[in-house]
Structures are given as structure tokens and as C-alpha cells.
Amino acid sequence: MRISPEEEVKIIKEILTAMNVPEESSDIVADVTLDADLKGFSSHGIGRFPQYVDGLRHGTIRADGDITIERETESTALINGNHIFGHVVAYRAMELAIEKARNTGVGLVGVHDSNHFGVAGYYSDMAVMNDMIGVVIANTEPAVAPIGGRKPILGTNPVAIGIPSNRYYVSVDMATSASARGKLLEAARKGESIPENVALDAEGKPTTDPEMALKGSILPFGGHKGYALSFMIEILAGPLVGAAFGTAVTGTANPEEMCTKGDLMMAIDPSKMVDPDEFRAQVDEFIEEVKSSGDVLIPGDIESMNIKRRRAEGIELDEKLLERILGIARELDINLEIKEL
């Protein structure tokens, strides 16, 4: 069935309210989750929501609480998320990075003891909406084998970058693995195969079975180049921010485990370097030059098209996910009515 964006928000907020999550936090979680579905990152949208519910039940996600700023300078900060919703922690972290960038030109905020935060691009978009460049990286629990290895040591380690422009939505949001783990989980839930050259089974053999891939490892994207980028992110979102790294990272996929991953948020104010109007105009000029070379998409075009289509056509809820959500509602004694679009 298909539901409207407003219906998705209603579902999420009704369930979180019943689980004693404050309204402000529920609003952020719902908005980030909807953003993922609208852009086409369904593996991080409402399909991921039951994992957060399980985290609340197991106590690995705290329904309420405050972040703690452990260290701070004019341009940097280190945040302890105290295991509240990762979406809320990341939102507050980027808010702080933007505030610092407004004063000093650059804001850099590290996060540890948080939780899965949904799509990284939501937070880089926050910077863009404040006429800034946004950069977000994070590590995740082991899923990726290094080149030449069989054992998962690296996470899928996403990176998102958003650039302000006058005419275009400019954003990249991607895992440094050949596939996000969430896409494997989604394929397994739907009983679908995954593409070739994405994953290995537990014996190090190529597989298109998502269940076998989840027991094995995902390949880095782009061979040794993706591996090298993931390697660096593991350090920047691990030791640099006081978070776990490598095989010590837990809780980004298994809601029964406390999350030990790290995040790094950066906001850059172009006005501290160049004239901001000229910067945006030159970004547009570059994009138009790129597009003039042929039938070319820029980073962010697909997401823009998805947003328009899904706002008009709705968001797909597959049967298994629908039953899971209705089951959660029954367990919480909620009379949840889901309106089909």
C-alpha cells in the first residue's frame, strides 16, 4: 500500500508518543525518517523504524535525556549523546556546528555514545539551509572486509556533503561500501536478491543472497579507493571523537546492543572565505557546465526527482513492514488507523 508523507509522520509520532518519547524528539525522528523515504533511501526510512522501537524496548535507546558537551572551543565541540535517539543528537550536533561556523567560519562537532541517526544527508542539508557547506561522516558496526581480507572490520561508514546553490539541490549521501547495510536488511525482509559484486558470504565467496551477505561481509565501493576512504572515516569518526572503532563498534544494526559508533559534523561558512553570492553563482555556473556535456545528473538530482514523485505518489509500505508496524501498535495498545493514499 501507499501512504502520504503526512501519514508516515503520524504513524511514527503516535508510536513514539506511546513509548514516552518527548514531542520535540518525536518530531525530529519523524522528520529525518520521512526525509529518507522521500529521497529514496527507503532502507533508512520507515522500514528502519521498528529497529528504533526495539532499541527503546531493550533500553539501548533512551526515550528522553539531554546531550552533554564534554569539550568545547570557539570552533569545536565534543558531545556525549547519552544514548538518546541518534537523530536528536545529530540534529543538536549540527545546530552547534552551524552556530560555531557563523562565528568562526568553521564548526566541527564530534559525537559519541549516540545511536543510529537515519540518513546523513539530512544533517548536511541543515547546513545548506543556513547558507553553509555541510559535511557529515560516521562509522558503523563491522560490515565491510578490507581489500584482501574476509573478516568484516570496517563499517559501511557513510559520508554526506551538501553545497549551497541558487538553483540546484547539491548533495551526496553515500556509504563507502558497495551497499548500505540497511539495503541488505531491506532486501532480506522483502525476499529479494542483491546485485553481484556487492557482498561475500562467511567463507569469502561472492553472494547475491542478502541473508548470506549479512553473515559475511560487504565489499568496499570502488575497490581499494573505497577501502581507503572508509579506513580514514573509521579514524575520524572513531578515535577522534572518543567513539569505538573497527570490531569494537556495536549497536548500529542490532538494537539489543548499546551503540558505540561515532559521528563527525562540520559546517563551513563560505562568507568567511569569499563573497557568498558569488560562491553560489559559481556553483551554479559549474553545474551548468557539467550538465552541458550531455545527459548528465549531478549529485542530488535523483533525490530531487524522488522527492517530487513521492510527495505526489506516496510512500510504499510493503506487506511485511505494514504487519510489523500494526503489530507494534497492538502491543502498545494503540488503535492505529493507517490511511491508504
From Swiss-Prot:
Q: Which keywords belong to this entry?
A: Coenzyme M biosynthesis, Cytoplasm, NAD, Oxidoreductase
InterPro entries xrefs:
LDH2/MDH2_Oxidoreductase, Mal/L-sulf/L-lact_DH-like_ah, Mal/L-sulf/L-lact_DH-like_NADP, Mal/L-sulfo/L-lacto_DH-like_sf, Malate/L-lactate_DH-like
Q: Does the keyword Cell inner membrane apply?
A: no
Which reaction does this enzyme catalyse, per its entry?
a (2S)-2-hydroxycarboxylate + NAD(+) = a 2-oxocarboxylate + NADH + H(+)
Which pathway or pathways does this protein act in? Cofactor biosynthesis; coenzyme M biosynthesis; sulfoacetaldehyde from phosphoenolpyruvate and sulfite: step 3/4; Cofactor biosynthesis; 5,6,7,8-tetrahydromethanopterin biosynthesis
Protein EC = 1.1.1.337
- Identify the main location: cytoplasm
Query: Which Gene3D superfamilies does the protein's record reference?
Result: 1.10.1530.10, Hypothetical oxidoreductase yiak, domain 2
GO-annotated molecular function:
L-2-hydroxycarboxylate dehydrogenase (NAD+) activity
Q: What class of enzyme is it?
A: oxidoreductase
Q: Does the keyword NAD apply?
A: yes
Q: Which domain of life is it from?
A: Archaea
Record GO cellular component, one term: cytoplasm
**Compartments where found:** Cytoplasm
Q: Which GO terms describe its biological process?
A: coenzyme M biosynthetic process
One Pfam family named in its UniProt record: Ldh_2
Cited function: Catalyzes the reduction of sulfopyruvate to (R)-sulfolactate. Involved in the biosynthesis of both coenzyme M (with (R)-sulfolactate) and methanopterin (with alpha-ketoglutarate).
Which family does the record claim for this protein?
A: Belongs to the LDH2/MDH2 oxidoreductase family.
Matching entries from NCBIfam families are given as:
sulfolac_dhydr
Q: What is this protein called?
A: L-sulfolactate dehydrogenase
Organism this protein belongs to: Methanothermobacter thermautotrophicus (strain ATCC 29096 / DSM 1053 / JCM 10044 / NBRC 100330 / Delta H)
